[in-house]
């Protein structure tokens, strides 16, 4: 488990959790979907994140999911486990559990939500997690869901810790540019916004933690490859075609749109767990038409 696991990793899929109609996890649906993703340029998988409907997963379900995916992937790409909560002690226990579990390259720890810590509180929270075990930590900064923002200067303080290896940044391009300019060389920056992948990578970010890679991985990879080859004209052309698909995938509360497309394509993504609900038939028809164009 180290930052080297992410060498040349640009596209990490924020993996959905497939459910059966009774609401239980559909473990039988995992192999087909995972093999599809790996065949279409997914270079890493994030489990039990936002797209996985993690607020509705029990702790035992998350561990079962980790074990099942780990067995299927069998070391072919790095795995990241969602380990963060708004309780530092609980998060520490989860980090230790995943570290002991083995086979995961990092844990994704969200900025604590609801209790609105100060910057110093956030700093101490993440330092405590990083000190708790040898599992590398990637910070998940998403104020749109959390309310609290981990400010860039606090992020850079945390980036000095050898066990805090990166960030999934869902703020803005100004922050990404500032982090790229000021971070340690071995600190990874992933945008968590599919629509900003073109700009973030052009600014020097390392990659994207993506929802759209479930359905449009080839396009995303082609864009990343063009940026790496400094063919900005080609990358921009792909981005112009890619953006409407991203907008469609987030036109209804995620992951309802991506599950609608995957179900249409025969991947048994299944329903969502309340309080999230599936797209209406009309919403699904419109989204599928755009995403598959």
UniProtKB/Swiss-Prot annotation:
Function field: Catalyzes the condensation of (S)-aspartate-beta-semialdehyde [(S)-ASA] and pyruvate to 4-hydroxy-tetrahydrodipicolinate (HTPA).
Catalytic activity: L-aspartate 4-semialdehyde + pyruvate = (2S,4S)-4-hydroxy-2,3,4,5-tetrahydrodipicolinate + H2O + H(+)
Protein name stated in the entry: 4-hydroxy-tetrahydrodipicolinate synthase
Gene name of the record: dapA
Site positions per UniProt: Part of a proton relay during catalysis: 50, 114
A Pfam family of this chain: DHDPS
Keyword line: Amino-acid biosynthesis, Cytoplasm, Diaminopimelate biosynthesis, Lyase, Lysine biosynthesis, Schiff base
Recorded family membership: Belongs to the DapA family.
Cell compartment(s), UniProt: Cytoplasm
Protein source organism: Streptococcus mutans serotype c (strain ATCC 700610 / UA159)
């Amino acid at each position: 488990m180290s930052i080297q696991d992410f060498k040349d990793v640009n596209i990490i899929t924020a993996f959905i959790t497939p459910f059966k109609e009774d609401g239980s996890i559909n473990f039988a649906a995992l192999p087909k979907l995972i093999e599809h993703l790996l065949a279409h340029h997914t270079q890493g998988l994030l489990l039990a994140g936002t797209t996985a409907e993690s607020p509705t997963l029990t702790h035992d379900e998350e561990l079962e999911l980790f074990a099942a995916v780990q067995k299927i992937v069998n070391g072919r790409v790095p795995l990241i486990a969602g380990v963060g909560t708004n309780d530092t002690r609980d998060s520490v226990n989860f980090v230790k559990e995943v570290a002991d579990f083995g086979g995961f390259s990092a844990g994704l720890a969200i900025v604590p939500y609801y209790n609105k810590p100060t910057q110093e509180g956030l700093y101490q929270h993440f330092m405590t997690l990083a000190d708790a075990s040898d599992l590398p930590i990637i910070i998940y900064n998403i104020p749109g869901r959390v309310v609290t923002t981990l400010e860039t200067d606090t992020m850079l303080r945390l980036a000095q810790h050898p066990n805090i290896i990166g960030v999934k940044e869902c703020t803005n391009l100004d922050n990404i540019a500032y982090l790229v300019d000021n971070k340690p060389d071995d600190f990874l920056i992933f945008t968590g916004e599919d629509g900003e992948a073109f700009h973030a990578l052009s600014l020097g970010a390392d990659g994207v933690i993506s929802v759209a890679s479930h359905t449009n991985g080839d396009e995303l990879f082609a864009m990343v490859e063009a940026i790496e080859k400094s063919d900005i004209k080609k990358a921009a052309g792909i981005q112009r075609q890619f953006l409407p698909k991203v907008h469609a995938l987030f036109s209804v509360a995620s992951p309802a749109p991506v599950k609608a497309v995957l179900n249409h394509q025969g991947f048994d993504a299944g329903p969502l767990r309340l309080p999230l609900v599936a797209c209406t038939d009309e919403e699904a028809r419109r989204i599928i038409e755009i995403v598959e164009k």
